[in-house]
Amino acid sequence: PTDAYQGKLAAQLVTRSTGKWGALAGMPIAAGNLFIGTFDGSSAMADPLGATHFGLPLGQKPVRFLGHYRYISGGNVTGKDGKEIIPVRRDIGQIYAILYETDDNVQYLDGSNITTSPNIVARAMFTGIKETEGTGYELFDVTFVYEKPYDPEKQKNFRYNLAVVFAASERGAYFE
């Protein structure tokens, strides 16, 4: 249960141990996450990064990405063996949005290329996550930075997808 910045509901994302089964599979933690897109559960064990399909079509040019968050770190980052990674560093969450172009070869981005794909047109990466006191919310307000020209014709044809990602652990996709 959690409170909300506004209204009655809020998403609470928590990184948890996956227990013995997850550890045996090399996936000792599961980071709580919320994203726009789909998840292919049938391929999650064999290809966890490929199972997450980020983004949905967008018919407008995004300018800003803003909202509110509250964050309490889960502690120090651990590796797939459950031991702290050296040098020791504190876990931190992620908040970002990616606008990318779809084409005949790229219908979606996944966990392996969400921040590296050549199809990325613009990014809004919030890098200022800080731990809060546990009450109250912090504002994030990020301007989209365009890396490629925006094409209104592609917009009309819904050739742009928008991915929005919130993750409790920055390296959660890699089970760290």
Label for each model-derived stretch:
Residues 69-86:
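Short amphipathic, basic-aromatic surface patches that mediate peripheral association
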Residues 1-66, 88-176:
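Aromatic (Trp/Tyr/Phe) and Gly/Pro-enriched flexible surface segments
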